[in-house]
């Protein structure tokens, strides 16, 4: 599941306009360029579909994916339904210029998230000052050791950068 901003650029209006997409992560594909293309196409198609909906339609569609969590909150215990996803991936755009506090430059800004019931892993990346960093938060029962995932993430990013010529 990927939360996406649906706010039009330069509107100046307050508030959030957010929807959620289910994205094919293409983990079944061995070619990194093909994986990246598949994810990009899936996200572009999903965003276009959400942009074509009214705010009420986006809310209703997004609520379908969160329905199992709502049932659990209502019942006060794990409900009979499981969420249709157990991985959330999010990107939070940060400032493009360096930040300082008392003259000290901020070197990195690492994101943090809180997994909800039924969620195994949250991957949030954030950008600041022309760099991007990743924060991984996992359910200790489902993902007892996140460290190997960091190594795999570094290796995958290297493959993707090579595939696109960076």
Predicted regions located by residue number:
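Small-residue-rich loop/turn and linker elements
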Residues: 1-13
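Low-complexity, glycine/alanine/valine/leucine- and proline-rich hydrophobic stretches
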Residues: 83-158
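Flexible helix-coil linker/hinge segments at domain or subdomain boundaries
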Residues: 48, 155-166
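Short proline/glycine-enriched turn/loop segments at secondary-structure junctions
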Residues: 9-11, 75-79, 112-113, 124
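Solvent-exposed residues in well-ordered beta-strands and their adjoining turns
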Residues: 5-7, 24-30, 128, 137-141
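Helical lid/core segments from catalytic subdomains that handle acyl or acyl-like groups
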Residues: 12-95
